[in-house]
Amino acid sequence: MILEERPDGQGTGEESSRPQDDGSIRKGYGSFVQNQPGQLQSHRARLHQQISKELRMRTGAENLYRATSNTWVRETVALELSYVNSNLQLLKEELAELSTSVDVDQPEGEGITIPMIPLGLKETKELDWATPLKELISEHFGEDGTSFETEIQELEDLRQATRTPSRDEAGLDLLAAYYSQLCFLDARFFSPSRSPGLLFHWYDSLTGVPAQQRALAFEKGSVLFNIGALHTQIGARQDCSCTEGTNHAAEAFQRAAGAFRLLRENFSHAPSPDMSAASLSMLEQLMIAQAQECIFKGLLLPASATPDICPDQLQLAQEAAQVATEYGLVHRAMAQPPVRDYLPASWTNLAHVKAEHFCALAHYHAAMALCESHPAKGELARQEHVFQPSTPHEPLGPTLPQHPEDRRKLAKAHLKRAILGQEEALRLHTLCRVLRKVDLLQVVVTQALRRSLAKYSQLEREDDFFEATEAPDIQPKTHQTPEGPLSVFSTKNRWQLVGPVHMTRGEGSFGFTLRGDSPVLIAAVVPGGQAESAGLKEGDYIVSVNGQPCKWWKHLEVVTQLRSMGEEGVSLQVVSLLPSPEPRGTGPRRAALLWNQRECGFETPMPTRTRPWPILGWSRKNKQGKTGSHPDPCTNRNCVTCP
């Protein structure tokens, strides 16, 4: 995980920061103006300062307008307010253009790909840790605060370096190291009864509006937000014209989605719009969609060498439909208030363009699969599943034709929908002033439109007087194997892989009871049955059935698979959770690190007394009923005994 605990001084960043005596502090790229990312950060910082100045002027003018009753003064103040509001609007539009700038985040390769949406880092002001920490050390711990000046200076240098992290693993390590130090500080110096009295000042990443709080959770949340934002910048600059680049980009966007989800689930009372629950949920969906897009781009690379293979084209059609579905969800989330009020309009338009573009690509690849090969006997059912709805509640479409002429007609219908979709994407592209400057986006959509038109011309005949058929929707599906589930397969649990274990049906059943979904749990084992003889135990999780991974299978899928087994039996592979290690014995507390892992976790103890205004805090979730507690299967209505 990117939020793991790291000792101070482990790993190095770039050496452009100010020099240190012992070299233990990792560094960012130092000056704001040494390179292109630094220039962008410097421009954002200047815009944030100007926005903050205009906001203060507007607040003062509004107070004067309410306080005076002089008509001439009120008219003059109203005129000045109109100027201030105009300046604020221009500054926010300029900041939005910076947020959608693709010049800095161009992929490193030469391939032409659709640009991604990177997220800018949150800016902050310099913070004086020395004075409040020295006072607290002297008053509470009874030690000389001046004897810790070196350590406090290292902390200040580390925070200063996190303002300009390098866009690589060193930058991520830098932010994670500072986050770990904040966890240590939270456990040692912050409590409901005492606090160093620091004021943390951060600017909103989307609007540039300043926010400040005295809660350390605000500082921790802002650093975690920057970890996710830095992952988006790393993913956006990958070269998606090669397999390695698409894999790195997909991984970076998935990690960004994980950071935003962790922040959303544990963060409350956000003082800035970019850290609100609605914004974080939208950002999580956006990163998932961009990761899915990278997966699709990776599949295009090997498939381009063999375009006449029908299974590859069908897979590409479903993957493109999956990307279109994800971007459709993102576009709806961006269009909902209050997100649409402060989100750059170009982001919403780009998500809409991508939804139309990838939906058109899905129909294009479906047409390629229909017209370039005749399906085998076993392949027809698979093609039917691609074009038919996956749920029984939706009406079934027409049966997939087998005759070449009928397949050509259906392919033309899909190409027609592809052409209409690409034309709609180009129309949406021209409506946005910011997107019109992105030449790569127009080039990619135009190339896709030309491919569809060329293929449609090949299928067009002079004697085509038949009634045009309506092409069915492509069922979205991704063939990417997910990792996890995290409820079991994470660093919180220790487990052991058992098997494969072969069992045969004895006296009508395999001798165990199943419960739960993803993964399915063995809730009970019949004494003396086949499962007990094979070594299966209560609490084991089934991860493989006859060599097929089933960690993400639903309960019904596993039961159906087991019931279909004949006299040959079944081969299962399970994982057994191991007991957690006993807590370490109580001993002298170290000065730098803490014994208890909870002390450097994500929670901040909430005060017992009520406050007049809610402050930003980390919520504690109720973790009961999770892994490790197995209720009696006889009282669980979801239990099913495998026959």
UniProtKB/Swiss-Prot annotation:
Its keywords, alphabetically, are: Coiled coil, Phosphoprotein
Q: What InterPro entries does UniProt report for this protein, alphabetically?
A: BRO1_dom, BRO1_sf, HR1_rho-bd, HR1_rpt_sf, PDZ, PDZ_sf, Rhophilin-1_BRO1, RHPN1_2
Segments for region (Disordered): 1-43
Q: BRO1 domain spans which residues?
A: 115-462
Name one cellular component (GO) term.
Answer: cell periphery
Report where it is expressed, by tissue: Highly expressed in testis.
Question: Which residue range or ranges hold the REM-1 domain?
Answer: 30-104
Q: Which residues carry this modification: Phosphoserine?
A: S31
Using the record's annotation, list all stretches that form the PDZ domain. Answer: 500-577
Stored SMART domains: BRO1, Hr1, PDZ
Q: Example GO biological process term?
A: negative regulation of stress fiber assembly
The UniProt regions of compositional bias labelled Polar residues, in chain numbering, are 32-42
**Compositional bias (Basic and acidic residues) at which positions?**
15-25
The protein's matches in PROSITE patterns, at most eight in alphabetical order, are given as: BRO1 (PS51180), PDZ (PS50106), REM_1 (PS51860)
Q: What is known of its domains?
A: The PDZ domain mediates interaction with ROPN1.
What job does this protein perform?
A: Has no enzymatic activity. May serve as a target for Rho, and interact with some cytoskeletal component upon Rho binding or relay a Rho signal to other molecules.
Subunit (UniProt): Binds specifically to GTP-Rho. Interacts with ROPN1.
The entry assigns this protein to a family as follows:
Belongs to the RHPN family.
Q: Which PANTHER family match?
A: RHOPHILIN (PTHR23031), RHOPHILIN-1 (PTHR23031:SF6)
Protein name, UniProt field: Rhophilin-1
